[in-house]
């Protein structure tokens, strides 16, 4: 089976690509480095020839509503239109737990993406996951000064490799609409996770938790990004991920569910 991975060069994408290949299937990376521009659709027609399913893990770093909605809307529409023409039978999108409850700019873009996929011309599935373990390090990297900041938010982080394995499993199983939410095994305050990453990197600067303004900040601090009900849970804890070199980026890309322990239900 040939599976295309949109955003296949990012953190999630590398794990998804590895999981596809480990399962014995062919991975086609949809990225600019592979000659595909998802913002204008260039190269999509050729790249999707013979593809049975597309897994979309594209991302943007903007927190602004208009930019997020524009990015995810443009990419999703271009993918779905090209998939329909190419006869692709399944579109799988990675989303975030809390997208339906937290009115944060970035999340509103993901919400728009979900709506397009679930109402689109190609049978679709949406998998919402909690933040990846890697997210804490990404937050730390945004601050180069003596102090780092983290949003005051509760999270139940999951390993990117386990999320990737779940996405591939979903792609192989067939369209499911909105799938059960995937979360990690433990609940933390995000600032605590950022502090752990800082210590693992040998940094001793303080990490301050800052509550974001408005209803979005209240929702984040109140557990709006925690899973809303029972569903699959990853097994790799944050501390195990750290011990494996996660804070320094030395954890290898996924080679399939066995690389980190398959996400259990």
Where are these regions (language model features)?
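NAD(P)H-binding glycine-rich loop region in Rossmannoid oxidoreductase-like domains
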Residues: 25-86, 96-101
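Glycine/proline-rich active-site loop of Rossmann-fold NAD(P)-dependent oxidoreductases
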Residues: 134-145, 170-180, 203-205
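Conserved beta-loop-beta element that borders a ligand/cofactor-binding pocket
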Residues: 87-90, 95, 100, 112-138, ...
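Mobile cap/lid helix-loop segments that border enzyme active or cofactor-binding sites
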Residues: 187, 194-256, 261-265
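A conserved pocket-lining segment of Rossmann-fold NAD(P)-dependent short-chain dehydrogenase/reductase
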Residues: 125, 138-158, 162
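Non-catalytic, hydrophobic alpha-helical segments
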Residues: 12, 54, 160-167, 182, ...
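N-terminal Rossmann NAD(P)H-binding glycine-rich loop of SDR-like oxidoreductase domains
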Residues: 1-23
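Glycine-rich Rossmann NAD(P)(H)-binding loop
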Residues: 149-154, 180-187
């Amino acid at each position: 089976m040939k599976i295309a991975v949109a955003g296949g060069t990012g953190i999630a994408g590398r794990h998804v690509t590895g999981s596809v290949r480990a399962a014995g299937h062919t991975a086609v990376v949809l990225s600019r480095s592979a000659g595909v521009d998802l913002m204008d659709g260039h190269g999509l027609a050729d790249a999707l020839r013979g593809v049975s399913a597309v897994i979309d893990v594209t991302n943007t770093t903007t927190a602004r509503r208009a930019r997020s909605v524009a990015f995810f809307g443009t990419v999703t529409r271009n993918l779905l239109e090209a998939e329909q023409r190419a006869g692709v039978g399944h579109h799988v999108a990675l989303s975030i737990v809390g997208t339906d409850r937290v009115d944060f700019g970035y999340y509103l873009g993901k919400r728009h993406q979900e709506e397009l996929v679930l109402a689109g011309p190609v049978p679709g599935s949406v998998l919402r996951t909690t933040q990846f373990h890697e997210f804490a390090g990404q937050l730390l990297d945004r601050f180069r000064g003596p102090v780092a900041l983290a949003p005051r938010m509760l999270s139940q982080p999951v390993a990117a490799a386990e999320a990737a394995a779940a996405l591939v499993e979903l792609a192989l199983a067939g369209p499911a609409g909105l799938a059960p939410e995937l979360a990690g095994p433990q609940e933390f305050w995000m600032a605590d996770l950022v502090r752990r990453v800082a210590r693992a990197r040998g940094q001793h600067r303080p990490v301050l938790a800052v509550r974001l303004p408005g209803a979005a900040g209240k929702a984040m601090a109140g557990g709006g990004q925690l899973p809303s009900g029972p569903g699959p849970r990853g097994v790799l804890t944050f501390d195990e991920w750290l011990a494996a070199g996660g804070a320094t980026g030395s954890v290898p890309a996924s080679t399939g569910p066995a690389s980190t322990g398959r996400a259990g239900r």
